[in-house]
Amino acid sequence: MVNYPHKLSSQKRQPSLSQPKNFANRGMSFEKMINATNDYYLSQGLAVIHKKPTPIQIVRVDYPQRSRAKIVEAYFRQASTTDYSGVYNGYYIDFEAKETKQKRAIPMKNFHPHQIQHMEQVLAQQGICFVLLHFSSQQETYLLPAFDLIRFYHQDKGQKSMPLGYIREYGYEIKAGAFPQIPYLNVIKEHLLGGKTR
């Protein structure tokens, strides 16, 4: 058969012998799902939460063409704190998002001392601080309050992995939806604010 417009003959593809594909999120990364959720919250007037930019210092740029600049060398200016921050009903929100392919735990090496210190400072100012944890192999997402993350971090000095059992005991599972995709404000309202808002 000839395919228009390139007139290439089609060839039958051999089926792949690899593992079956998981189309649960249709290729959307966890970060993109959070960003889409935040866009939904903003469009509905529910919250203003944005991803924090990572400050970088550009060192070298190549210009292969006048209109196509390419950054070839850059460095982080400073250690970043958490991924997202904003406001929900007058409450300051600050959170980190982590995704793992592991089935039973999340490595604590994914959390850096400056992030833990930042979370402690947010909690000291009465902010709402937490981490969203996504286990991609099981398609499970949890909101773990920063207090419980910090407690575990200090127990093992950030060396081990946090077991899924601990996360299930102290965190709150978030079932993925359509709009919003990761409805974490529901957990904040029901569990962290006791069902009330200002």
Curated annotation (Swiss-Prot):
Binds 1 Mg(2+) ion per subunit. SUPFAM superfamilies: Restriction endonuclease-like. This is Holliday junction resolvase RecU. Belongs to the RecU family. Keywords: Cytoplasm, DNA damage, DNA recombination, DNA repair, Endonuclease, Hydrolase, Magnesium, Metal-binding, Nuclease. Endonuclease that resolves Holliday junction intermediates in genetic recombination. Cleaves mobile four-strand junctions by introducing symmetrical nicks in paired strands. Promotes annealing of linear ssDNA with homologous dsDNA. Required for DNA repair, homologous recombination and chromosome segregation. Its EC number is 3.1.21.10. InterPro entries: Resolv_RecU, Restrct_endonuc-II-like, tRNA_endonuc-like_dom_sf. It is found in: Cytoplasm. It comes from the Bacteria. GO terms for biological process: chromosome segregation; DNA recombination; DNA repair. Disulfide bonds: none annotated. Signal peptide: none annotated. Residues 1-21 are annotated as: Disordered. Mg(2+) binds at T81, D83, E96, Q115. It catalyses: Endonucleolytic cleavage at a junction such as a reciprocal single-stranded crossover between two homologous DNA duplexes (Holliday junction). HAMAP family: RecU. Its cofactor is Mg(2+). One of its GO terms (cellular component) is cytoplasm. Residues 11-21 have a biased composition (Polar residues). The record marks K98 as: Transition state stabilizer. GO terms for molecular function: endonuclease activity; magnesium ion binding; nucleic acid binding. Gene3D superfamilies: 3.40.1350.10. The lineage of its organism: Bacteria, Bacillati, Bacillota, Bacilli, Lactobacillales.
